[in-house]
Swiss-Prot record:
CDD domains attached to this UniProt entry: ATP-synt_Fo_a_6
Pfam families: ATP-synt_A (PF00119)
Protein name: ATP synthase subunit a
Spans through the membrane: 23-43, 83-103, 113-133, 188-208, 209-229
Species of provenance: Rhodospirillum rubrum (strain ATCC 11170 / ATH 1.1.1 / DSM 467 / LMG 4362 / NCIMB 8255 / S1)
UniProt membrane topology term: Multi-pass membrane protein
Keywords noted in UniProt: ATP synthesis, Cell inner membrane, Cell membrane, CF(0), Hydrogen ion transport, Ion transport, Membrane, Transmembrane, Transmembrane helix, Transport
Gene this protein is translated from: atpB
Gene3D superfamilies, per database record: ATP synthase, F0 complex, subunit A (1.20.120.220)
Similarity comment text for this entry: Belongs to the ATPase A chain family.
Superkingdom as given in the UniProt entry: Bacteria
Purpose: Key component of the proton channel; it plays a direct role in the translocation of protons across the membrane.
Length: 241
């Protein structure tokens, strides 16, 4: 691998053509499937033999449950708990995808705008449907802040509408950009270590190690940010704040 961006190349593992459309099973597909498999295996093993005194897996699952549940309660309220399964699935999928991408010779599917955009657009559509289902045409009121002078409507409504429609763009680009930039930085710094050799590469190696730890933190943080923004959008749809 010579180019820092070569690590993001999607490579077909099993070529599949359907009516002239390429739907091949790729390295990205494999990692997404692995992510789903790991998440399912974790929750299955954590909940299969529940005990009053929890073991390590059950404790981890309970901590994860409370973490996501508190995120929903704090940002949406108790009424948002009905969407807990979706929020939990979203967080675990993005979190594991980011973490698996940190492994050597792995693939970070969250570094592809197509994946993050699909997630963001799905969230946007779901939140919009929830908003209209709950409030009907009154949902349009969120584009005009309560208490604002009527004369400001021609200015505020377009601004609020553009802000609302840009949500899937900002949500997808934030995750995609952070994961892409972080991995490119790691690749470039790792290349310096190899070029400088054992002696000259001591300092760069320490830098790479520090950046790697930071990248793990960013990977976890981005999963949290992605999920909490989803909760905020959901709160807007439910409570119209």
């Amino acid at each position: 691998m010579h180019s820092p961006v070569e690590q993001f190349a999607i490579k077909p593992l099993v070529s599949i053509q359907v009516a002239g459309v390429d739907v091949s099973f790729t390295n990205s597909s494999l990692l997404m499937l692995l992510t789903v498999g790991l998440a399912a295996a974790f929750f299955w093993n954590a909940t299969a033999r529940r005990t009053l005194i929890p073991g390590r897996l059950q404790s981890a699952a309970e901590m994860l449950y409370e973490f996501v549940a508190n995120m929903i309660r704090d940002n949406v309220g108790k009424e948002g708990m009905k969407y807990f399964p979706y929020i939990l699935t979203l967080f675990v999928f993005v979190f594991l995808g980011n973490m698996l991408g940190m492994l050597p010779y792995s693939f970070t599917f969250t570094s592809h705008i197509a994946v993050t955009a699909a997630l963001a657009v799905g969230i946007f559509i779901a939140v919009t449907i929830i908003g209209f289902a709950r409030h009907g045409f009154h949902y349009f009121r969120m584009f005009f802040p309560h208490g604002a002078p009527l004369l400001t409507a021609p200015l505020l409504i377009p601004i609020e509408l553009i802000s609302y429609l840009s949500r899937p763009f900002s949500l997808s680009v934030r995750l995609f950009a952070n994961m892409t930039v972080g991995h490119i930085m790691l690749k470039v710094l790792a290349g310096f270590v190899i070029m400088l050799g054992v002696v000259g590469g001591v300092v760069p190696f320490a830098v790479v190690l520090g950046v790697t730890v930071l990248e793990f933190f960013i990977a976890a943080l981005q999963a949290y940010v992605f999920t909490i923004l989803t909760c905020i959008y959901l709160n807007d749809a439910i409570n119209m704040h």
